Amino acid sequence: MKVEVCSFSGSKVYPGAGRLFVRGDNKVFRFVNKKSESLFLQRKNPRRLSWTVLYRRMHKKGISEEHAKKRTRRTVKHQRGIVGANLDVIKEKRNQRPEVRAAARAAALKQRKDKKAASESEKKAIKAKSAASSARGQAIKNAKAAARH
């Protein structure tokens, strides 16, 4: 037994029941009753008539308890190592006491300051040396110029 579906209302049309409508372009429409056929021919929208299956499907009527709620994925945080520090090193630093961490920070800061001061003094020495040589060159030029006059 082949059960058809109404082209308008979406309800089942059993063999020997319902009406058949063939349009000019040979498209076949099956209707469960005269009411569905009449509304189809009046070009009514089945989604706006509350008794049709299409309306019920569109407005989520009757089948809501059948579907389980859609689950959303939860984000899970993971601890991972980064370049230059693996996970063990990171955990070790995190578990250090604040005083130890502050002392290490102060030592690193002092080391950086010392290094910067050393490089600056080196630059000053180079600058003084170049200034002295240029001053000597200038003095020689001045002496030659005085000798000419």
UniProtKB/Swiss-Prot annotation:
GO terms of molecular function: mRNA binding; structural constituent of ribosome
Gene3D superfamilies (alphabetical): 6.10.250.1270, Ribosomal protein L24e
Residue stretches of biased makeup (Basic and acidic residues): 93-102, 116-125
Main localization, broad class: cytoplasm
GO cellular component, one term: cytosolic large ribosomal subunit
InterPro entries reported in the protein's UniProt record: L24e/L24_sf (IPR038630), Ribosomal_eL24 (IPR056366), Ribosomal_eL24-rel_N (IPR000988), Ribosomal_eL24_CS (IPR023442)
PROSITE patterns the record matches: RIBOSOMAL_L24E
BP terms from Gene Ontology: cytoplasmic translation
CDD domains according to UniProt: Ribosomal_L24e_L24
Keywords carried by this UniProt record: Cytoplasm, Ribonucleoprotein, Ribosomal protein
UniProt-listed SUPFAM superfamilies: Glucocorticoid receptor-like (DNA-binding domain)
Compartment annotation: Cytoplasm
Region (Disordered): 93-149
PANTHER family per UniProt: 60S RIBOSOMAL PROTEIN L24, RIBOSOMAL PROTEIN L24
General remark: There are 2 genes for eL24 in S.pombe.
Task performed by this protein: Component of the ribosome, a large ribonucleoprotein complex responsible for the synthesis of proteins in the cell. The small ribosomal subunit (SSU) binds messenger RNAs (mRNAs) and translates the encoded message by selecting cognate aminoacyl-transfer RNA (tRNA) molecules. The large subunit (LSU) contains the ribosomal catalytic site termed the peptidyl transferase center (PTC), which catalyzes the formation of peptide bonds, thereby polymerizing the amino acids delivered by tRNAs into a polypeptide chain.
Family to which this protein belongs: Belongs to the eukaryotic ribosomal protein eL24 family.
Name this protein carries in UniProt: Large ribosomal subunit protein eL24A
